[in-house]
Structures are given as C-alpha cells and as structure tokens.
Amino acid sequence: MSLDPEDYKEPRCPSCTDFYYPDENANVSFIPVDRVVDRLDTLLSHNDMPAARRHLEYWLSEARMGGDKRGELAVLNELMGLYRKMGLKDKAFESAEKADELVKALSLGGSITAATVCLNAATVCEAFDRPREALERYSEAKSIYEDFLPPGDSRLGGLYNNMALACVSLKEY
C-alpha cells in the first residue's frame, strides 16, 4: 500500500480546493501558435528552409519545456510537412509518430485536429514511397473530415487530391 500526498498533507486553507483538484494548466506556458505559424509562412515565402527548421525546432522545445501539449502538436504538424519538403525521412516519421501520440494523450481522436494529423502523416508516407500506408491515413482523415466539414471546404478538396495521387501510385484507378 502506498500513500499519496493528499493522505498526509493538508491544504493551505479549508476552502483551497487546488490541493485536491489541481489545475492541469496552472503551470503551463503556452506558445503563441498563431505567431509561430505566421513567421513560418514568412520564412517559407522566402524559401528559407533552414531558418524555418530552426524556427519550428525552437518553438517545439519551448512548447515541451512549457508543458504546452497542444502547442507541441501544432508545431509537430508543421514540422512533418517541413521535414517532408526537406527530404528528412526519419525526422518526418518521428514527428508523425509523436503527433499521433499527442492526439491520443490529449483525447483528440475523431476531431478535426486528429484528421489533420492523419492527413499530414499520410503526405509523409506518400513522399517516402509508402503509398499503401498513406492511403490508410488518408482514409482516417476522410472519415473525420466528411463528418465535420461542410462539402465545399477546401480541406476536403486537398484530401481528395492527395488520396487520388496515392491511388495512382498504387495503380488503383
């Protein structure tokens, strides 16, 4: 039998509930995801891939040090695409794997965010000659996107286009 801190410690005052029900986000330092993505877009518009990589890797470490899991997921999503464009296969797959783990840890399965992770991971698979795996990931994204997005949403068009390319790679017309 083990003792938990609440078995032998007392809260600061009788009405302080944070001792028994701590706020999970109390010590989280959130990264400015919108600013990170805006700066990334600027760097990519100048085709400065090395700077974009440094930028994203810096913010990934900031998110991890600050305990910002959602920020970490956002940066990993961007890194998947950047590593893919740079031809960094191992880094791209590592980012995809970590993003999948975060989707599970944050209980985001079945969400638009989860679908976007699937889509980005699928493009990584497609880029590095794994079209069968890519098609499976695209199918996961498709089932979520079709449930939540309106028919004219551009994300659906992009998904269908990418799925078609995977089908062509597999000679499944």
Q: Residue locations for each model-derived region?
A:
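Amphipathic alpha-helical segments of tetratricopeptide repeats
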Residues: 60-62, 100-105, 142-147
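Conserved alpha-helical positions within TPR/SEL1-like repeat arrays
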Residues: 34-45, 71-85, 112-127, 154-169
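Intrinsically disordered, low-complexity regulatory regions that flank or link repeat-based scaffolds
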Residues: 1-24
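Short coil/turn linkers that connect adjacent helices within long alpha-helical scaffolds
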Residues: 26-27, 65-68, 105-109, 147-151
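TPR-adjacent "capping" and linker segments in tetratricopeptide-repeat scaffold/adaptor proteins
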Residues: 19-35, 66
